[in-house]
């Protein structure tokens, strides 16, 4: 009986390991996409401004897409990243949630106002977005266009 349990736990751990991606070298593509080696991972459930996207802050026009990317770069620099593999999107990118020291990067970006809950696909980050909005954090302190609207209009 104990051998069956041991085999079950062994096989379960192999299954869970194959659904995770680990790396210490990360390249930030934009505010919601990274590369771990050759694997491009799009954070599921969030949407960040496009690199060329701008917002209007009190000091004038700012590159909010670049700010979102730079925020992610600062968070992952010199840290080990782990990501879940949740399948692929229509562009062939791996969809997943990535973590630094156990903290979800998606949750962090949305809660700080540098990405939005992508309600079209998930409600997971809605509370984080409500927090950022009510505290006027990140893009919530500016005039902005949602990334999905920006893509449609440009």
Where are these regions (language model features)?
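Small beta-barrel nucleic-acid-binding modules, primarily SNase/OB-fold domains
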Residues: 2-154
